Amino acid sequence: MSMRSALAFLRIFSALLALGSAVPAAAQSPQPSARVVLVDKDNDGGYRTTTNRSYTGVRDRVIKARMLERLRDFLSPVRLPRSIGLLAAECDGGDDASPFYHSGYRTITVCYQFIVLVETITDKMMAAIKKDPKAYPFPITREEFLWGLIGGVLLHESGHALFDVLDVPVFGREEDAADQISILVALHLRPQLAEAAVKSYAYFWHTVPDPDSGVKNGKMNEDFADEHGTGSQRLYNGLCLGYGHSPAVFGKFVSAGWLPQARAKGCAQEYARLESAFVRTVLPFIDTKKMAEVQAVDWLAANYGPAQPATAVTVRNTPPPAATARSDAPPGGQGPVGRGTP
């Protein structure tokens, strides 16, 4: 495949981004049985039951939306050397528990608490936009913000999983690389979805205050030791990728002052480096036939639209019995149910 063809391929398919150089794809032999699977337990389909009334409704909603099945379908074109498991559950960590990837079990866990949190954040964001619409460069609907944010976090965790399973070395913080995956992937969905993803990402991080940088009692603020960047850094990095990919679409973020001109000047080059990394390190893992099926789907409508049946893609992979996502998974396919931070 020529470089021109590879770049054209990238523009119609969203998968993942790898930073730096990676082990050549030919050196890793995908196993025929390796795939993204739902980690079933007691025939729950990957959606763990909960006795907490605060989350029983959430479980019903994500089952109806086929959230795990759709994430599995979305990742299905990637030829995996080892399987990745998906499950949804009430996680440890209280009300602010977030989705996370567990490298020991190679499992992505979606926490019910996270869905409640995002719904609350969405309501607050919609109220803020309604109160002062001129403060936000682009209009955004409740559905776009809600599912743009949820989808972005799931892609972020999928990035961690793919870095691990594909043995992709990452230079710098892996959290930054996972952020870049979620934006790069979103930018290559349909235009409406790409715009919704970048807007929701920017508006969310715009509301997150940065930690105090002062020294207190002779000790630096330990918030800066976190593996994640600050809210402002994540905001600027995401906007730079969006602007670097589509300056005509996202130029209003620059003119409105959300993305400084000094940073915006180099965004096309930043984006080009990321795109080149994808073509060199990940493209050989992609099944083009399955890619065509995935690319044809309007994921926002098919996943979560009020009137759209979730039948747009037929995936030929049938999930295996309980806990076969990894041979050493705990009895019953429970997998980790901890606390994550996107």
Each language-model region and where it sits:
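Active-site recognition of the HExxH zinc-binding catalytic motif
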Residues: V110, G152-V165, D179, I183
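An active-site-proximal "capping" alpha-helix that borders the catalytic cofactor pocket
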Residues: F171-L189
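Zn2+-dependent metallopeptidase catalytic core
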Residues: G57-R82, V118
